[in-house]
Regions:
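Hydrophobic alpha-helical transmembrane segments of membrane proteins
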Residues: 1-65, 83-227
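Alpha-helix N-cap/helix-start motif at helix boundaries, enriched for small hydrophobics
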Residues: 79-81
């Protein structure tokens, strides 16, 4: 556990110069929520934006050729990978908390009514969308790097646009979902948590295997260059 936390702290140190940029990305969804007068849309937008910052650590690592450093650190590859997931999840959780505090306040100032049901629904949707984005992004970055895998940065944008399209084109489905949430909120939360846990378990497993293969290939190339 200590090595996982050390790995997380390393990622925090790597991304520290970008903290101002990350904080700025949380202001835009507040404006978006105010324009649309919707907490659900605003929180979904916030989680989309913060998911796009997932590639920062991979970009910094790649630019500074830190793959070999990770190969010689006295830390298991699985601990490095899990530490990065912890960092990403912490960023997502912090962004969600800020959004669920700031956006309802702005909406109330504008005269909108924001109840507990709206906050819970927005929180569940935000967490699920963030998980849905990052479980694909992180293995993609591990596999292709931040440059070749730049396309993975736009997964949240595509997902958010699809979400908006579905909400606008299929109001009947939206109403049925709301009725399900109102009738059995505990079941919905359980299913959402279960789906998120399964998705992250598979994603972490894939990332660990990719990381091990990449480090192994680097060690093989180094051995060949010395002979």
């Amino acid at each position: 556990m200590s090595n996982i936390l050390k790995s997380t702290k390393l990622d925090i140190a790597l991304v520290k110069p970008y903290f101002k940029t990350i904080c700025f990305t949380l202001l835009l969804p507040i404006v978006f929520a105010a324009i649309n007068r919707s907490l659900l849309t605003g929180v979904s937008f916030a989680m989309c934006f913060i998911a796009m910052t997932t590639g920062y650590t991979f970009s910094i690592t790649e630019k500074n050729s830190m793959d070999r450093l990770f190969g010689i650190l006295p830390v298991r590859k699985s601990e490095l990978v899990i530490g990065r997931y912890v960092f990403v999840l912490a960023m997502g959780l912090l962004s969600l908390i800020i959004s669920l505090i700031a956006q309802p306040l702005v909406l109330k100032v504008l005269g909108e009514t924001v109840g507990a049901f709206d906050i819970v629904t927005a929180a569940i949707a935000g967490v699920f969308l963030f998980a849905l984005y990052t479980v694909f992004q992180i293995p993609g970055y591990y596999k292709y790097g931040s440059i070749k895998g730049r396309v993975f940065m736009y997964i949240p944008v595509a997902g958010f646009l699809v979400t908006l399209l579905l909400l606008s084109k299929m109001p009947a489905i939206g109403n049925s979902i709301i009725s399900v949430v109102e009738s059995s909120p505990i079941l919905l939360v359980f299913l959402a948590v279960f789906a998120i846990v399964v998705m992250y378990a598979v994603s972490i497993f894939l990332s660990i295997q990719i990381m091990k293969n990449k480090v192994g290939n680097c060690e093989t190339r180094d051995a060949r260059s010395q002979t």
